[in-house]
Amino acid sequence: MLRFQRFASTYNQRAVLRKYPVGGIIHGFQVRRAVPVPELKLTAVDLIHEQTGAEHLHIDRDDKNNVFSIAFRTLPPDATGVPHILEHTTLCGSEKYPVRDPFFKMLNKSLANFMNAMTGPDYTFFPFATTNARDFVNLRDVYLNSTLRPLLKEQDFYQEGWRLEHSEVTNPKSDIIFKGVVFNEMKGQVSNADYHFWSQFQQNIYPSLNNSGGDPQKITDLHYQDLVDFHHANYHPSNARTFTYGSFPLEDTLKKVNEEFRAYGKRIINKKLPKPLELIETKELTLEGQIDPMLPAEKQTKTSLTWKCGEPTDLYETFLLKILGNLLLDGHDSIMYKGLIESGLGHDFSVNTGVESMTAANFLTVGIQGSQNVEEFKSKVFDLFKEFIENDVDSNKVDAIIHQLELSKKDQKADFGLQILYSILPGWTNGIDPIEGLEFDELIGRLKSDFKENGTKIFKNILDKYIIDQPYFHFTMKGSEEFSSKLAAEESTKLDKKLKELDETDRKAIFERGLLLEAAQNHKEDLSCLPTLGVADISRKVDTYDLNTNANITVRNTATNGISYIRGKKLINDMIPLELYPFLSLFAASLTHLGTKTTPYGAIDNEIKLHTGGISTNISVNADPTTLQPNLYFDMSGFSLNEKSDYIFNFLKTILMETDFSTHKDKLKVLINSIASSNTSHIADSGHTVARSFASGHLSTVAAIQEHISGVEHYKLISRLCSIMNDDKLFQSEVIDKLVMLQRIIVNSQNMEFFASVDCQAQENKIRKEVDYFVSTLPNTSSDISGAIQTACVPRYSDSQVLNLIKFPFQVHYTAQAYNGVSYTHKDGAALQVLANMLTFKHLHKEIREKGGAYGGGATFSALSGIFSYYSYRDPNPLASIQTFEKSASYVLNDAKWTQSDLDESKLSIFQQVDAPISPKSEGSTFFNLGVTDEMRQVRREQLLDTSLLDIHRVAERYILPNKSIATVVGPGIDGETVSPKWHIEDIKV
């Protein structure tokens, strides 16, 4: 039987290769190579368009989630953000689809599970993924026509890029200010301290590679004609790389691409790569940056050392460099982590730490956040390199890295095609063979034999060649309290300068242009030119999966490729005293950071990597899908090769029962500082979710618990803990004692359930025995902690706090407004979900983004928490957004002229995610994770499909129009507006 399977596999591979004969011509494309990559179960086909020289890579794989992308090399000429703004305006209408923003409008005319457009450092690409063949054709046509033949209207440049416009568009006496979607997006980016550090580092290590996203201070120097010229120069087939992945026929796509390309000739493209900073001698640079309000003043410095280490074109040396970076930096047992982070020199690595392949150079960077002595850091790094060279690398560490690489190949992901695209595109656009990068087995095999023959020498040679006694770039950024105000002053100065250059004719033109733009935004367009799917394309039946449930374990037997996935959860309702809720997330994180009385976590971590794909612990809270009552869980998970599944349970037992908080209090302090810094980055990136969670916490018990374990209450706790670290007695009583108490409460055998995904009956039997044994080794008695409370008694925020401000030193704001809705199984839940989607696509996108200039905005209904909410993202005018939110229900009932077609499009948009492909390990896990049965899912699906326009009006009138709402803004205070007592102010800082 095995012999037959091998023969069948070889036969299929040969059949695939016969489809792509080398030298053959397929619709104007010549096949240059067809390379089987058996370790990834795919064949890579390299083609070139004879007429234009455009390159196409096809990944032939038995995967129904098909991907298409078109990419262009787009070296930014300056820091005005022209590649980024072009990415936006390209999708604002084309010759074949002359409607405003066909890309956004296709989001609800499609069943694609992924649609986007992205700007990299020196390339721009437009990918999508779908399982529907007709959808694939529709989106492919829109993407090709939009990128090659966009309208590039000046009006779209003003909307998406930047413009001068009155703050009140219809009032010529109101202030003239800067507006624009990308302008505000990048102001939000600069507010993220990590992003600003990274972008300034990149700009200085690679001065010839400008900021493609755009510097807000430079964006307002860009002219419309610059945009048109940049498109003409770069969005040409000769400069394009197209990509397809999956099971759909390649010939159809090549035929369409050839039709689009044949109007073009071959253009000579400048393939010269910009060069990085020339490090003939060591260079140092210190700049000011954004302060981190969650860390104390003495921990506001980020600093790093960077060496140039060859070029990405040498694939094996680049691979070795990445392995070296892993040995030096990855994990608790790495020499740099122990010497720089565990030692307390920094609380975490800087965001640029690691190995980076950037255009024409590889870099190795070692950096820290929270440095109090930059010179001590630099000296320590040199000492650690010397120590690394003087000692042999433990072969187990190399084996662990190889094990992780090999396991990652077998770990099947639902978005595998997109992941391949992301991995190859940066190098492909700069002349690196994309297929060689897919051949992992060859690289790993060479590493194994090289390390066996030469040992540590292969890594020491790289250090000797590029690091030891070589010049480097020392980059430091010091957090400044005045940073945001200085940026605001610079913007004000630039605005004043532009305003002084205006005469009355200019001012009149600006006013009239604003009116014209608003009129265009309000104009209802004929969208009949856009291709669309219909509700009939959506199945009325949910996908179900056979499960084997016995006692406390449920097993899904499916194609896991020889991997066992284990998830466990423990219900901890009625166990946790209220004062310990904010400590729950810290407790879960501590288990995979500290270690035991006898073994540091670094040693445990290395064993975990050697034998498994990883172990994790977490806290989650879910609402009952019928009653909305909260269920609080301690979660644990891990995965490994089938033959090593027992290691998962051994490691879980070790970290649960033996983690010692007192022995490793210094590591605990490092972890707390790291969490504080991560919290700041999270708020800068996802402030709208923080605002939404805080607002929801006033209305829902589940949301209130979530706030305590991972929201504002948790942020406040972490900030307070950062301020007491130097007081050992206080730290013991306020932190360590509480974590020990949680360990006593949580670690026992009661209320434990498991879910396993395996690929054969024998492995299922093995897992069941391992679960039984694991549970039997845990204490079987409940905690003796007194004063436990019901989760339902967790206090919500006062609902009299209708307006809330969470103060952060950003340049833009994030807003949310929350309302009580209904449970997952309630008959009105589906209509509320459709209402939220229709408001997003048919109203709020126009009002919040196009008119208001925010980067994003919309409405959501969380069926699993029962909360309906509005939000805006990187918003220059949050108070106007709140007014828009408050008027939205009235708009639905009185002004919206929504049609059945509008309703159907919203259903398509919702089912993009409902029916998105899932990985084998996720099959059948919905009930285990959320308590939602297949029967509930089926009823919900039918309710979504059957929702009518009358239902939409009914739920808007019943749940949104009359109900009390809670609004929250994240960002800086607004003078004269966000003041007490009208506003409740939360100031999260040390």
Curated annotation (Swiss-Prot):
Cofactor(s) it depends on: Zn(2+)
Binding, Zn(2+): H84, H88, E185
UniProt KW Transit peptide keyword: yes
Pfam families from the UniProt entry: M16C_assoc, Peptidase_M16_C, PreP_C
EC number: 3.4.24.-
Predominant cellular place of this UniProt entry's protein: mitochondrion
Transit peptide: 1-7
Highest taxon, organism lineage: Eukaryota
Gene3D superfamilies linked: Metalloenzyme, LuxS/M16 peptidase-like
Gene Ontology terms describing biological process: mitochondrial protein processing; protein processing; proteolysis involved in protein catabolic process
Active site per database record: E87 (proton acceptor), E160
Enzyme's top EC category: hydrolase
Function, as annotated: Degrades mitochondrial transit peptides after their cleavage in the intermembrane space or in the matrix, and presequence peptides; clearance of these peptides is required to keep the presequence processing machinery running. Preferentially cleaves the N-terminal side of paired basic amino acid residues. Also degrades other unstructured peptides. May function as an ATP-dependent peptidase as opposed to a metalloendopeptidase.
Family: Belongs to the peptidase M16 family. PreP subfamily.
Protein name: Presequence protease, mitochondrial
Organism in which the protein naturally occurs: Candida glabrata (strain ATCC 2001 / BCRC 20586 / JCM 3761 / NBRC 0622 / NRRL Y-65 / CBS 138) (Yeast)
